[in-house]
Curated annotation (Swiss-Prot):
This is Nucleoporin NUP35. The keyword Protein transport applies. SUPFAM superfamilies: RNA-binding domain, RBD. Transmembrane segments: none annotated. GO terms for biological process: mRNA transport; protein transport. InterPro entries: Nucleoporin_NUP53 (IPR017389), Nucleotide-bd_a/b_plait_sf (IPR012677), RBD_domain_sf (IPR035979), RRM_NUP35_dom (IPR007846). It is found in: Nucleus, Nuclear pore complex. It comes from Xenopus tropicalis. One of its GO terms (cellular component) is nuclear pore. Functions as a component of the nuclear pore complex (NPC). NPC components, collectively referred to as nucleoporins (NUPs), can play the role of both NPC structural components and of docking or interaction partners for transiently associated nuclear transport factors. The gene is nup35. Residues 173-253 form the RRM Nup35-type domain. PANTHER family: NUCLEOPORIN NUP35. Residues 1-32, 61-82, 122-142 are annotated as: Disordered.
Amino acid sequence: MAAFSMEPMGAEPMALGSPTSPKPSAGAQFLPGFLLGDIPTPVTPQQRPSIGVMEMRSPLLSGGSPPQPVVPTHKDKSGAPPVRSIYDDIASPGLGSTPLNPRKTASFSVLHTPLSGVIPSSPECKNISGSRKRPASSVFSPATIGHSRKTTLSPAQMDPFYTQGDALTSDDQLDDTWVTVFGFPQASASYILLQFAQYGNIIKHVMSNNGNWMHIQYQSKLQARKALSKDGRIFGESIMIGVKPCIDKSVMEATEKVSTPTVSSVFTPPVKNIGTPTQSVGTPRAASMRPLAATYKTPASADYQVVADKQAPRKDESIVSKAMEYMFGW
């Protein structure tokens, strides 16, 4: 009776759980075949997607070979994925453990190779940074930049006529109040001088005898810079003027020799008004100022004197006035 009652109970769950599987043996009535290690039959259509999913996920998750029972079943099938090519990418030498690393390395080297100009031997950052520094130092070296600046700002290049710059050296100090105006005809020299007189006080100007330029000295460096900003301006709708810093040392030296005794004679005060004339040479403004103590002293030879008026009202100091002040508060 016990054996008779167990047969229908064992046959009913097998018929409901796996209808397509073959009839199980008597020893494995309550357990499915995949738990006991049985190889599934290739005829069942439900096992094909499960095998394909296991084969595609196994290289990415574990990185090892798939289970032995699965490999012989999908090699004979036409719908199985190319497992061999996936394993070749993982086991290739010099790359990472996952197939994503060779893609990153290749893109990294492709992106950085045009910048450096040299193909690095390994995808390390040190080699790429080193190869990047080499062309930068050769192209944009500080020595090259300094050399180009020096050539652009040299006095020979600033000279519009390229004749006076050869006599200058690097130790020469030029006067920044001098400018050279050029590009005008001889008939318009006075007109151009009048136009440049609007930018500052002109101390001296030297005209060229046969050329189309003149040297102008302003009172301050700020006025000279204002005149330099008019380089390339058109005057009279037909004359374009160029303005450059003056580098003609002969004009500056001649002006200094002439103006040196004149300046000393102008700023030398008379000896009669000041007791120490040596201090007034260095400070000409202090020589013309009066000492502060002189305002509080009235000299005997002054033109104006304060005379005390005898008829000025004064306070009465008599006894009666004092008594009235005490009593009435006056």
